[in-house]
Structures are given as structure tokens and as C-alpha cells.
A protein has these predicted regions:
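Histidine-acidic metal/acid-base catalytic patches
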Residues: 1-10, 14-30, 57, 97-99, ...
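Short beta-strands and strand-loop turn motifs
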Residues: 7-10, 37-38, 66-67, 102-105, ...
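Active-site-proximal loop/turn and secondary-structure-junction residues that shape catalytic pockets
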Residues: 12-14, 41-43, 69-72, 107-110, ...
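Active-site acidic/histidine proton-transfer and metal-coordination neighborhood
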Residues: 19, 58, 78-175, 185, ...
Length: 284
């Protein structure tokens, strides 16, 4: 994937990617000298792709898009709807000039059946990702599968599970997307997920244990960075902290209280902390 260096999830400034949100978020990302941004495609058809592309080009900023599937298009039970939803999102990603569509592209945030995943669910997901990868290839887009914690989804919780799905599909334009917040819950150790996914890992969310300011929780940052350095990671390092969320997103992520004072606290303290660690371990 062509995205490298340090980026930030634009939830730091907005979860509504309209023209105003795009202008504010991109201006802020430029201010903090980010290499790329991650844009949440909560409503892909409504995004003014030409406007976003012009802003990205103007500021020479790269972008990745991300999403979780709505219940009406959960891949495990509604594969045809998921294929169509991802087709629209992939097209919008390409039109915006972004290089990848990642996140919970296999299911929904909050999708749980109450029982372990079934072979039928995984077969449906593989079918969806196969179709999506073929369409993404025609648009020059890569796809990322993000392993998320058991409370948000029951299907892919660890780096190894993400690898298993990617190898099941067998498409070379799908990569593993890890997240330190989820890893801190699901992996035996932070390094385990990174080592398990090393052949496919191209993108990682750097998110604190409470989703707040990095460096002020209990994520084992030295272990994380040491493992990334050990595998020669050269993908995207994306800081993710949820400050501005609409109620439906807060519900899906189970965030019920402020996790940081404001964006200045996260960008002023958390970002330098993460960048300094990355420099310490030779990642940037």
C-alpha cells in the first residue's frame, strides 16, 4: 500500500464528511504535518468526492477510507447487499483519490449473534471479499480487514483470524489492518498479533486502551513498536482517538464518557508521544 508514515483518523475533527467537515479536517491534518488522513465513509453516496480530491491534491495529502457495514448489509447474512455497499464505497474511495478502503469491511460494529462464528458466516464473508477485491482491483484500490474486539463483532477479533480470512480469499490486494485498542483486549500479547499478521500487515491504528490520549493508558507501546520494527513494518501508522462522535457511532463503540479533554490534548500530547516512539524504533 502506498500510504506510509503518520496519519490520523479524521474522527478527531468530524464524523460528518461533508464539505465543511472535509475542509476543517484536512486543514488540521496539514497543520499537524500528517502524511495521510483516514476518512470514515459513513454515508459514501453523500460525499463530494471531487471536493475532497481537490483538497487532498492541493495539500499533497494521502488518504485512506474506512467503514463498518450497516446492519442492512452485514456480509455474514446479507452478502449480496454487502457486495453492493462495498462497490459504492470502493468507487467513492477511488473518486476521492484515496488509496485504500479498510475497517470492518466484513461486518458491522455491534454485530454479534451470541454464539461462535459459523462456517456459513465465514463463507459468506469470503464471497463478499472476493467480489469486492475484484472490483477494487479495477479501481486501483486496496482493501483492509480490521480485526476488532469481541464486544464490537464476533467474526474477526485477532490478527491471525484476519490472516486466515485473507488467505482464504487469496486476493493480493487485501491486507491486515490492526488496532492497538483491540489488540490490547484480544491478543495474548501486543506483539503476537503483529507477528501473526506480518506477511499481510500494512496498516495499524495507534489507539490508547481507553481510546483517549496515547501515552496516558495501559497500551504496551514499547512492545508494539518493537514488534513493528522487528517485522520491518513500512505501512501506515494512524492515530485514532474518538473525540467527536454522533450518538449512533458512540453506541457502536460503547463510548459513554469523554475519553480526552479535547483535540488539543490528543494532538498536543498523544501525537508527539507516538511520533517520538516511532523515531526511537526507526519506523519513521
Amino acid at each position: 500500500m502506498s500510504v506510509q508514515g503518520f496519519g490520523v483518523h479524521t474522527s478527531m475533527w468530524t464524523m460528518n464528511w461533508d464539505r465543511d467537515g472535509a475542509e476543517r479536517a484536512i486543514a488540521a491534518a496539514v497543520k499537524y504535518k500528517m502524511d495521510f488522513i483516514e476518512i470514515a465513509l459513513l454515508n459514501a453516496p453523500a460525499v463530494d468526492a471531487a471536493h475532497t480530491r481537490a483538497l487532498l491534491d492541493k495539500h499533497e495529502l494521502s488518504a485512506v477510507c474506512s467503514l463498518g457495514l450497516p446492519e442492512s448489509a452485514w456480509a455474514s447474512v446479507r452478502p449480496d447487499a454487502a457486495i453492493e455497499h462495498l462497490r459504492v464505497a470502493i468507487d467513492k474511495t477511488a473518486e476521492m483519490g484515496a488509496v485504500a478502503l479498510s475497517g470492518v469491511i466484513f461486518g458491522g460494529i455491534g454485530e454479534r449473534t451470541g454464539v461462535p462464528p459459523t462456517e456459513g458466516e465465514y463463507e459468506n464473508i469470503a464471497r463478499v471479499l472476493t467480489a469486492a477485491s475484484k472490483h477494487a482491483r479495477t479501481r486501483g484500490i486496496e482493501l483492509g480487514v480490521e480485526a476488532v474486539n469481541r464486544y464490537e463483532n464476533h467474526l474477526i477479533n485477532t490478527g491471525w483470524q484476519a490472516v486466515q480470512m485473507i488467505e482464504r480469499v487469496g486476493a493480493d490486494n487485501i491486507f491486515v489492518h490492526l488496532d492497538t485498542y483491540h489488540m490490547n483486549i484480544e491478543e495474548k500479547g501486543a506483539a503476537n498479533g503483529i507477528l501473526d499478521a506480518r506477511e499481510h500487515l500494512k496498516y495499524i491504528h495507534l489507539s490508547e486502551s481507553d481510546r483517549g490520549t496515547p501515552g496516558y493508558g495501559n497500551c504496551p507501546w514499547d512492545e508494539i513498536y518493537a514488534a513493528l520494527a522487528a517485522i520491518g513494518f513500512r505501512g501506515g501508522l494512524a492515530m485514532e482517538s474518538f473525540i467527536n462522535m454522533p450518538p449512533e457511532v458512540a453506541y457502536g463503540l460503547a463510548v459513554w464518557r469523554p475519553v480526552a479533554k479535547d483535540e488539543e490534548e490528543v494532538m498536543g500530547n498523544g501525537l508527539p508521544f507516538l511520533r517520538n516512539k516511532a523515531k526511537q524504533y526507526g519506523l519513521i
